[in-house]
Design a protein with these regions (language model features):
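Active-site-proximal helix/loop segments of hydrolytic enzymes
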Residues: 1-174
Length: 174
């Protein structure tokens, strides 16, 4: 939550209103509830912030990656049937993913794992431009030492905010 809260503060300084789907370390259903909350708001965009893990115990994996929505017929939308494949939403999601990834790598110097597409529920069920960021690997002991640092959280939040502002500059009418 540290990076999310710092991002909120950065965006508020830019004059951007921020809706948090959670403000503490508690669970909010990621399959539909976060998207439902977002869809009921008047938000311009959605960012889901995570730290990665391979699930293989100790890992050598490193870096930051950003995801935007990829349709998969095996995973049909539950609450976003109308907008999940909307061309404008998808184009704006791709721009957001690229602007944020570029800013994160520039600010942190982390390994660039790239911008990828996936059918994650929070990306599928959210009716506005949406991305999911993975900010480093918690199961890599050396990377974990970096991502545990408050100063690194500050840099991540600054980069995320800059990526959002770059997106606003690139997308007309926002």
């Amino acid at each position: 939550m540290s990076v999310s809260n710092k991002l909120r503060e950065n965006l508020l300084q830019y004059g951007i209103n921020v809706l948090m789907t959670r403000t503490g370390d508690y669970d909010v259903d990621f399959k539909t509830e976060r998207s439902r909350m977002t869809n009921a708001s008047n938000a311009d965009l959605f960012i889901s912030i995570h730290f990665n893990a391979t699930g293989a115990g100790v890992s050598n994996a490193t870096g930051i990656e950003t995801y935007w929505y990829q349709y998969d017929p095996e995973y049909q939308p539950k609450i976003n049937k109308e907008m999940h494949n909307n061309p404008t939403r998808l184009a704006e999601s791709e721009i957001l993913a690229n602007k944020v990834q570029e800013s994160l790598i520039k600010e942190t110097g982390a390994v660039n794992r790239g911008v990828r597409r996936e059918t994650f529920a929070v990306l599928r069920e959210t009716a506005i431009p949406a991305i999911l960021v993975e900010l480093g690997f918690m199961d890599n002991p050396s990377e974990l030492q970096v991502i545990k640092q408050d100063s690194y959280h500050t840099r991540l939040a600054k980069a995320l905010a800059q990526g959002v502002m770059n997106w606003y500059g690139a997308v007309e009418g926002k």
